[in-house]
Amino acid sequence: MATFQSLPGFREFYPDALARRNHIFRLWRQTAVAFGFAEYDAPVLEPLELYKTKSGDEIEAQLFSFTDKGGREVALRPEMTPTVCRMVGAKANALKRPIKWFSIAEYYRYERAQKGRERAFFQFNADLFAEPGPEAEIELIALLTQCLKAFGLTEQDFYIRLSDRNLWFFYLEALGLDEPRIRAVLSAVDKFEKVGDDAFKPYAEQFGPLDLALKQRVLEFLQIKTLASLEQTLAPLGGEKLAARLGDWRKLLDGLAAMGLSPFIEVDLGVVRGLAYYTGFVFEAFDRKGELRAIAGGGRYNDLVKKLGGPDLPAVGFAIGDVTLGLLLDARGLMPAFVQASDVYCVIGGAAERQAAFADVNALRAAGFKVDYPLKDVPFGKQFKLAADSGAKLALIYGPDELAKNVVKLRDLTTRTETDVPREQVQAMVRDFFSTD
């Protein structure tokens, strides 16, 4: 007989796993709403061209794509940013600004399944449109930090690495590189931490080996860890645009400090983000012990709305993945144990008593109580074991004697005390029991 298993990288959520997922979603949603963000959703299937031209080569290589029955080339979404930019661009004139949106959705990437990485995964995405200044980054980084602190994580558990593609462009242009070479160098910088010098091989294949002196300057820039060092290194370049950009850095770091977030922030120019559309500040969150891949990442993408046919609208966004976050919460002992427990269990004597119990079961459920009962006739002794296994705190006993007296016996399953209650008072007594529990 054939057996079927789920596909590699696609998770099945049994009730306990789904309870964990819902816990994560609930705190994400609660935090975003507290920051004034509105929730949205979008199609899971999109035109293939949306990602081929906007997300970059790495994402394109990971797409689940096919030709549908109408002859259209389509793909399961690997990310949300192009979609939300299209949505905002389509109704930009009607939307109240700044536009602060979030979503919790599933994404698909055909890559090797490994620790912290699946082929189907959920992300919390938050984006802020129509604010060109660093005030937007302050708000987004504050939201990211709180989305992780909400689970009990502290500055001892995670930190956020902050970088700037703009400053990289200023610096590399000053070293004499044109835009194609700058992008190739940034691609190498993005991978340097993982693979070392091998990160520069694609540059060499495309343009020839990078000049050793220039490469040394790149590696020195990578080592900068403070704003003061940034200013000192870039001071000889001069220019109003560079001065303004360094002013943005001061405003951003001062704003984060005023929010009390400095313990979470590290200047780290090794973060450039691989996606093609980032244009300014970029940031990633990591666990302090360095045991996991990035927990979250994002940055500014000022050109994408316009490239997708909308108005010229600046934007910043980030995403947190559920897989790595779940691993971190487990490692820190911060994922609660989820037990599905009833409030009330009905112990039923037989067919006649069952009919009487059904009215109370239905009324109590309608009143918001979690009520369970045996679906078939079972001996009383076994029913009390079922009641204990259900996690219920209260048992309602419907036996022949109780039915004859038009009462129900209430048993406190913790203290084992029992009380006879008139049928018409059952709901009120149950409510009183749980209000004083």
UniProtKB/Swiss-Prot annotation:
**Gene Ontology BP annotations:** histidyl-tRNA aminoacylation
Name the reaction it catalyses.
Answer: tRNA(His) + L-histidine + ATP = L-histidyl-tRNA(His) + AMP + diphosphate + H(+)
Q: Name one GO cellular component term.
A: cytoplasm
For this protein, the Enzyme Commission number is 6.1.1.21
Instruction: Report the subcellular localization.
Output: Cytoplasm
What keywords were assigned to this record? Aminoacyl-tRNA synthetase, ATP-binding, Cytoplasm, Ligase, Nucleotide-binding, Protein biosynthesis
Q: Which Pfam families match?
A: HGTP_anticodon (PF03129), tRNA-synt_His (PF13393)
The answer on whether this UniProt entry bears the keyword Ligase reads: yes
Gene Ontology terms, MF aspect = ATP binding; histidine-tRNA ligase activity
Cited PROSITE patterns? AA_TRNA_LIGASE_II
Q: Mostly located where?
A: cytoplasm
Q: How does it assemble?
A: Homodimer.
The family annotation for this protein states:
Belongs to the class-II aminoacyl-tRNA synthetase family.
- Protein name, entry field: Histidine--tRNA ligase
Lineage start: Bacteria, Pseudomonadati, Verrucomicrobiota, Opitutia, Opitutales
Which gene name does the record give?
hisS
